[in-house]
C-alpha cells in the first residue's frame, strides 16, 4: 500500500502523482459511477483554499475516491464526512486515512448520495460525478440547516449554466432555479488531463453560497412557472401561454384552487382562462417578453401576478 504523501511541489508533486496512479491501477474505474480521480495536487490545493475552511468546520465530501482531496481537507478542518457509493473506493480511503494522523476525523458513509440522509455540515467540497450534477445541486440547496458554502467541480458547460445571466446562450431553467436559492461564483477551469482517467470534457469549479434565510417562496410553484417558460425560452410568453394544452392545465389548476378557497367560479371555460392569462401578461408588460431575457425579479413578479388572479402551476 502506498502511504499518503503530504502534497507539496516539485519532487513531492511527482511522488503524489505516482501514488495516485498506483492506486488507480489497483482496480478498474467504474464508468457507471462517473469515476475520474483528481490527480493534480496544485488543483487540489486551490480547491481547498477557495473553500475558506475554518478549523472548526465539518466538511461534506461527495465521491472521495481514493482520498486525494480528502487528505488535504482533513488538514484544514475538524471533520470530513465522505459519502462514497463504491465499496472498493471506501475501503481504499479507509486504509489510506488509517495510516495518517487524521483517522479519528473521517467518517465514511457508504451509499448513493441521492438516496442517503445528509448529516449536518458547514461546507461541501466535491469532485462531482457529472451524471448526477443537477439532482445533487438541488439536494444540497434543499438541505436544512443551510450550509455556509459549497465548492464543487462540475462539467464545464454545466458550471457555466449555473452562473449564466439573462441573454447568455446557456441561460436556462437551471440558471434561474439555482440563482433564486444561492449566489453562484465561477472559480476556475480544470483541464481533462488533471484526472485519472481523463474525462471526455473540460471541467470547472464553482462556489455556491445558499441564501440564508432562503426566499419565502413555494419552490414547486416557482419551478412550475419556470419550467413552462423555458420550454421554449426564445418564444414570447404570449406564444407559450396560448398553447391549448397549457391553457387546459392552468384552467384545471385554477378550478382546484377555487374549490379549495371556497370560491364559486369553478366552471370557467378554457377560453375564459386564455383571456385571463393574456390580460395578466398584458397588464404587467410581459406579453412580448421572452424567458431568455427575464431575470429573477421578473419571474418573481410574474409568479406573484399570476397568483393574484388565482393562476397556479401545480
Curated annotation (Swiss-Prot):
Which catalysed reactions does the entry list for this protein?
adenosine(1779)/adenosine(1780) in 18S rRNA + 4 S-adenosyl-L-methionine = N(6)-dimethyladenosine(1779)/N(6)-dimethyladenosine(1780) in 18S rRNA + 4 S-adenosyl-L-homocysteine + 4 H(+)
Q: Which residues bind S-adenosyl-L-methionine?
A: 36, 38, 63, 84, 112, 127
Q: Which residues form a coiled coil?
A: none
GO MF terms, alphabetically ordered: 18S rRNA (adenine(1779)-N(6)/adenine(1780)-N(6))-dimethyltransferase activity; RNA binding; rRNA (adenine-N6,N6-)-dimethyltransferase activity
Where it mainly occurs, coarsely classed, is nucleus
Recorded E.C. number(s)?
2.1.1.183
The record, for InterPro entries, names: KsgA/Erm, rRNA_Ade_Mease_Trfase_CS, rRNA_Ade_methylase_Trfase_N, rRNA_adenine_dimethylase, SAM-dependent_MTases_sf
Q: Name one GO biological process term.
A: ribosomal small subunit biogenesis
Q: Which SUPFAM superfamilies match?
A: S-adenosyl-L-methionine-dependent methyltransferases
- Superkingdom is Eukaryota
What PANTHER family does this protein's entry cite? Answer: DIMETHYLADENOSINE TRANSFERASE, DIMETHYLADENOSINE TRANSFERASE-RELATED
Q: What is annotated about its quaternary structure and interactions?
A: Part of the small subunit (SSU) processome, composed of more than 70 proteins and the RNA chaperone small nucleolar RNA (snoRNA) U3.
As for what it does, the entry says: Specifically dimethylates two adjacent adenosines in the loop of a conserved hairpin near the 3'-end of 18S rRNA in the 40S particle. Involved in the pre-rRNA processing steps leading to small-subunit rRNA production independently of its RNA-modifying catalytic activity. Part of the small subunit (SSU) processome, first precursor of the small eukaryotic ribosomal subunit.
This chain belongs to the protein called: Probable dimethyladenosine transferase
Naturally occurring in which organism (per UniProt): Dictyostelium discoideum
Please state the gene responsible for encoding this protein.
dimt1
Amino acid at each position: 500500500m502506498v502511504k499518503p504523501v503530504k502534497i507539496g511541489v516539485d519532487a513531492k508533486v511527482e511522488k503524489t502523482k505516482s501514488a495516485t496512479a498506483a492506486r488507480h491501477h489497483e482496480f478498474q474505474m467504474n464508468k457507471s459511477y462517473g469515476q475520474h480521480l483528481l490527480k493534480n495536487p496544485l488543483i487540489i490545493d486551490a480547491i481547498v483554499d477557495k473553500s475558506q475552511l475554518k478549523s472548526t468546520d465539518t466538511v461534506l465530501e461527495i465521491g472521495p475516491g481514493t482520498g486525494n482531496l480528502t487528505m488535504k481537507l482533513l488538514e484544514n478542518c475538524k471533520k470530513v464526512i465522505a459519502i462514497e457509493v463504491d465499496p472498493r473506493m471506501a475501503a481504499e480511503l479507509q486504509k489510506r486515512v488509517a495510516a495518517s494522523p487524521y483517522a479519528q476525523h473521517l467518517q465514511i458513509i457508504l451509499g448513493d448520495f441521492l438516496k442517503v440522509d445528509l448529516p449536518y455540515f458547514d461546507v461541501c467540497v466535491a469532485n462531482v460525478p457529472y451524471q448526477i450534477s443537477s439532482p445533487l445541486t438541488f439536494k444540497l440547496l434543499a438541505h436544512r440547516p443551510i450550509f455556509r458554502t459549497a465548492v464543487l467541480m462540475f462539467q464545464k458547460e454545466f458550471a457555466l449554466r449555473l452562473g449564466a445571466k439573462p441573454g447568455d446562450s446557456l441561460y436556462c431553467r437551471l440558471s434561474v432555479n439555482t440563482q433564486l436559492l444561492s449566489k453562484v461564483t465561477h472559480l476556475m477551469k480544470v483541464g481533462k488531463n488533471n484526472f485519472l482517467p481523463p474525462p471526455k470534457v473540460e471541467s470547472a469549479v464553482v462556489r455556491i453560497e445558499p441564501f440564508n434565510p432562503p426566499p419565502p417562496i413555494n419552490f414547486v410553484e416557482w419551478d412550475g412557472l419556470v419550467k413552462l417558460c423555458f420550454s421554449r425560452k426564445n418564444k414570447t410568453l404570449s406564444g407559450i401561454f396560448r398553447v391549448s394544452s397549457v391553457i387546459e392545465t392552468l384552467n384545471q389548476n385554477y378550478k382546484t384552487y377555487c374549490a379549495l378557497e371556497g370560491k364559486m367560479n369553478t366552471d370557467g371555460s378554457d377560453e375564459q382562462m386564455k383571456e385571463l392569462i393574456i390580460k395578466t401578461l398584458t397588464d404587467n408588460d410581459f406579453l412580448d417578453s421572452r424567458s431568455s431575457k427575464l431575470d429573477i425579479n421578473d419571474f418573481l413578479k410574474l409568479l406573484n401576478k399570476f397568483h393574484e388572479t388565482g393562476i397556479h402551476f401545480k
